[in-house]
Regions:
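C-terminal alpha-helix
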Residues: 109-121
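Short aromatic-enriched loop/helix-cap "lid" or pocket-rim segments at secondary-structure transitions
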Residues: 58-60, 87-90
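Short, polar/charged, Gly/Pro-enriched helix-capping and turn/loop motifs at alpha-helix termini
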Residues: 41, 121-125
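Long, low-complexity intrinsically disordered regions
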Residues: 124-144
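Short, contiguous clusters of charged residues that form electrostatic/catalytic patches at enzyme active sites
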Residues: 25, 29, 105-112
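Conserved catalytic-core segment of NTP-binding enzymes
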Residues: 1-82
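C-terminal boundary of histidine-terminating zinc-finger modules
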Residues: 88-109
Length: 147
């Protein structure tokens, strides 16, 4: 609650599962309580669907419910992905662990969508969308010689 009391905005991640809808309802009420009592500027900037498996009816139903009740839901959804699950165990973000994975691409899309929303509110100047970073490697000869 302290983080919400100090924040200007919150992004709520929601797993595409039934009980997550219940949790989203509770968290929305908590945000509203904090807005009334502690932080009138607190805003839900968006809801992010995560662990989304488009092959299941449940995920699609949860998505429909979330989008119906929370119009600020991000277009981007984060898919359920083995590579996303593996990355933390290797101590790396997905954009380093497997930059070409669907999860990495989804997070890059989310970053671009956030930038777009900030631009629409004139909070940042117009910028180019994120592009995958080039991998820079130091040739072995430079590593050995400390160049």
């Amino acid at each position: 609650m302290n983080a919400l009391a100090a924040a200007d905005e919150v992004i709520i991640p929601v797993q595409a599962e039934y009980f997550a809808l219940e949790g989203l309802g509770h968290l929305s009420k908590t945000v509203e309580m904090i807005r009334r009592n502690l932080n009138p500027q607190l805003a839900i900037r968006g809801v992010l669907l995560t662990m989304y498996d488009s092959r299941t009816n449940l995920a699609r139903e949860v998505e429909q419910e979330v989008r119906t009740h929370f119009p600020a839901t991000f277009r981007t959804v984060i898919p359920r992905s083995v590579r996303l699950a593996e990355a933390p165990s290797h101590g790396e973000p997905i954009t380093v662990y497997d930059p070409s994975s669907t999860g990495a691409r989804a997070y890059e899309e989310l970053a671009n969508e956030l930038i777009e929303r900030l631009r629409e509110r004139d909070l940042i100047p117009a910028v180019a969308p994120m592009r995958p970073r080039a991998t820079v490697t130091t040739p072995p000869s430079e590593v050995a010689h400390g160049a």
